[in-house]
Amino acid sequence: MADARGSSSSSGDGGGGEGKGGAGHGDFVGGGQHNWYHGILGAVPPPNVGRQNIVHHQYPAASLIQQHHQSPTMPLPMAQLPYVPQYTVLPTPAVLPSHHHHHGQSQISQENFQDWVPSNNVAAPHVPSAFQDWRQMCNGSAFMPFGQTAANSNVFYQNLTFNSWTSNNMPRNPVYTSFHPAAIEDHHAPLFHSNNHDIDPGFQTNFRMDQAFVPASSPFPPVSSSSHSFSSAKISNGPTYTKKAKKSNVKDPPIVFRRSDMESEKNDDNPDQTPVSEPPSMNQNGENLIIRFNCREYRVILRKELTNSDVGNIGRIVMPKRDAEAHLPALHQREGVTLKMDDFKFETTWNFKYRFWPNNKSRMYVLESTGGFVKHHGLQTGDIFIIYKSSESGKFVVRGEKAIKPNAIMPVVDCSCKNELNKSEECGFTISLQTKKT
């Protein structure tokens, strides 16, 4: 029977049961829960101003305890998960038979693993083959599809051949991969310098030369368009034409310059400066005779000792004013005229620019474009510049003469004929060497 507080008492004990109920449970049996709830409400201070008052309709006591800043944190009981051991099945390396090497790939590709559909959770029967048990290796973590573990034996085996397995699970050329299974270690592509290119070429680079761009004078034979492709095995053997290159003695053809080629490049200001020796003619006295010019017609009209400015890089020789105005053509304009003068020593015609400069109500006559003549004859400061003029044709002959040092041999120019008795014979200049006396 229940008492006023809601506690039950046994019929045998009577008041003793009630006494035990009051002593054992007190306020927590029957109406004790109601009193305990109101006791907590009285002990908890009112919430602070501005703090959110959390009211939970189902568990008000828990919400009040959560608002109290001094309430201890009660850890929630957590059920401990059972320990599940992790198993990892490593692939078993399969040792390949010795007869299955590069040349045996065609036979391997014909052997198919048993097509198998999982049924009743029964593992597939063990079928021995040339690669032993590939399924153990395929059950490894490296070859398992997503969502399966190594412990799961329900694996769907495809129609697994050597060609399909290598094309679906790994690169075609396993030499350049960072990881490869140990079971296929013997099936690498052949090395770069191996000689098994007829069976499995592997990695190789072909070099082809379609055009014969080797010069004809080269010791190396030209490569025609029908040349074969050079594989890596041929390249590793070294140069093929080394011995032929050492034995060949190919010489370049001599370079020949023709005078007609040089004359086509010269202009009016820079005539041909190539010295051409003239076959000397001998007179009765045995002296060299220059018969290109008739010495009876030519006489000296100008003689100038060269200065530093005359032999400089400017290429200009200042003419003596008296001789220039007396024997050279008269100038009416400052720009001047072009004078053609034959070289006395060489078969060359020089084109000089003859002009004047105004100088204090006077004129200074110059002969320009003389740099080539000075260099050709090797003239220096102190050497002599001589001009001859024909009395009949009016042509000019120019001559450069080296300065005569004391006690040195100097050339003497005379007019001589082949036959002194017959004055109608051709005459020319003769050059004789004499010693200058001091």
Curated annotation (Swiss-Prot):
Could you list this entry's UniProt keywords, alphabetically sorted: DNA-binding, Nucleus, Transcription, Transcription regulation
**Recorded superkingdom:** Eukaryota
- Gene Ontology CC terms: nucleus
- SMART domains this protein is in? B3
Keyword set includes Transcription = yes
- Source organism: Oryza sativa subsp. japonica
Taxonomic lineage from the root: Eukaryota, Viridiplantae, Streptophyta, Embryophyta, Tracheophyta
Q: What is this protein called?
A: Putative B3 domain-containing protein Os04g0676650
- Biased-composition ranges, Basic and acidic residues, are 258-269
Q: Where is the composition biased (Low complexity)?
A: 1-11
DNA-binding region extent: 302-404
Q: Where is the composition biased (Polar residues)?
A: 272-285
- Signal sequence residues: none
| UniProt region (Disordered), positions on chain | 1-30, 225-285
UniProt lists compositionally biased (Gly residues) regions at: 12-30
